[in-house]
Amino acid sequence: MEPTDQILIVVAMEAEALPIRRKLGLDGHGLQLSDHSSARIWRNDSICLVTNGINPRFGVDSIGTIPAALTTFSAIKAVEPQIVISAGTCGGFKKRDGSIGEIVIAERCFFHDHRISLGGFEEYGVGNFPVLDLGAVAKRLGFRTGSVST
């Protein structure tokens, strides 16, 4: 499959995705991303949006690192986008000046409370994954940059 010019937006929860879908004109129930998951996909000529879908056992949105990784991997494989945007709601820390409704652009991304106290596994446990440098974009739009953990 040839890479596309599409942008992939990954959102965990339907309630987070709905306003984005409305704004982008991505209507309907979407399509099932794969036979092995409940993830849903909507697309137009330039944007592809996926959600993790509903957990069949508990009947709630599939949230967390495992559904996010599986959905993102499957969507990247299916779409081969030029860029992936992980968007949605997350917690913040008031002591770090976080506030409800604030947009924060990631300058680093790591696992929250995922420490492994075995020699040589400390860095692996934390993750500290690279992200695209969007500092200039954040400044231009008036958004803050900061660390994002999952």
Task: Put a short name on every predicted segment.
Residues 5-28, 43, 47, 55:
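Short, conserved "active-site rim" segments that organize catalytic pockets and cofactor/ligand binding
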Residues 3-5, 34-150:
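Glycine-rich phosphate- or other oxyanion-binding loops that anchor nucleotides, phosphorylated ligands
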